[in-house]
């Protein structure tokens, strides 16, 4: 059966997107831990459907607002977790464990800046997916959605392209601020990040769904500007902390005004 619509849910610190079909549902990203109740409540109370209709949760990458709810959603609904085919965990080793703690701390900071109530954000540093996918694969049970490997923010970022409508979910590839688009923090690999932007531009999507922002049509000129202004050097976790906590005059805005 064909897609009915895509619902944007106002998650804890990000937008979450739910693909609604007559007989099944797919969550385009795992969200934060507190988003589990939001998603299940929407399915039960707004859609008036059993939570078992949630068949797939995609995890585009391992940050707290994209992977934090995945395991709990699977426990509650029996859904499949689908993620990138990587041999190693993003948060591997001692350094990875430290980075996991830092990322959770940064998520708490963003939540505070957005005026969100303090809540638990802890989730496993290691994802245990049911299925893994690569570039050009389709999502199991949802073959109208094509997987795009769009790394750069991390080493395993996925985007999801709905083939019939040409809508694309890009997770953290592009961040929408009030009046402009910017690159995310961190940037794991600037070169492949630019290639990922070009890949999405070349699709000529009808609509771009962003985890930080909303869904918008982005024209070729805007993509070209994003590519031209993309970081030329890595943005490390140290840079990310500075960006969150300090005044970044070279970005042209104050974090006091920033809503992510």
List where the protein language model places each region.
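Conserved beta-strand hairpin/beta-sheet module of binuclear metal-dependent hydrolase folds
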Residues: 1-47, 159-173
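Residue-level marker for buried hydrophobic side chains located in beta-strands
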Residues: 26-28, 58, 81, 167-169, ...
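Metallo-beta-lactamase
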Residues: 32-34, 123-124, 138, 144-222
């Amino acid at each position: 059966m064909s897609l009915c619509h895509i619902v944007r849910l106002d998650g804890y610190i990000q937008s979450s997107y739910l693909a609604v079909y007559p007989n099944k549902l797919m969550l385009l990203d795992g969200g934060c831990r507190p988003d589990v109740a939001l998603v299940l409540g929407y399915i039960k109370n707004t859609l008036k459907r059993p939570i078992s209709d949630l068949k797939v949760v995609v995890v585009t990458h391992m940050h707290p607002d994209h992977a934090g709810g995945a395991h709990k959603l699977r426990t509650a609904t029996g859904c499949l977790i689908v993620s990138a085919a990587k041999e190693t965990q993003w948060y591997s080793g001692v350094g990875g464990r430290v980075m996991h703690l830092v990322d959770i701390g940064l998520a708490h900071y963003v939540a505070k800046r957005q005026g969100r109530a303090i809540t638990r954000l802890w989730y496993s540093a290691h994802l245990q997916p049911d299925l893994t996918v690569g570039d050009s694969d389709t999502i199991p049970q949802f073959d109208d959605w094509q997987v795009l490997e769009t790394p750069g923010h991390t080493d395993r970022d996925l985007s999801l392209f709905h083939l019939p409508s040409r809508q694309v979910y890009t997770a953290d590839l592009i961040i929408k601020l009030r009046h402009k688009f910017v690159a995310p923090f961190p940037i794991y690999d600037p070169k492949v990040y630019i290639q990922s932007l070009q890949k999405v531009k070349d699709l000529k999507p009808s609509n771009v769904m962003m985890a930080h922002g909303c869904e918008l049509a982005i024209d070729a000129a805007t993509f070209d500007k994003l590519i031209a202004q993309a970081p030329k050097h890595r943005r490390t976790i140290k840079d990310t902390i500075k960006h969150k906590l300090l005044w970044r005059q070279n970005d042209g805005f104050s974090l006091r005004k920033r809503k992510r």
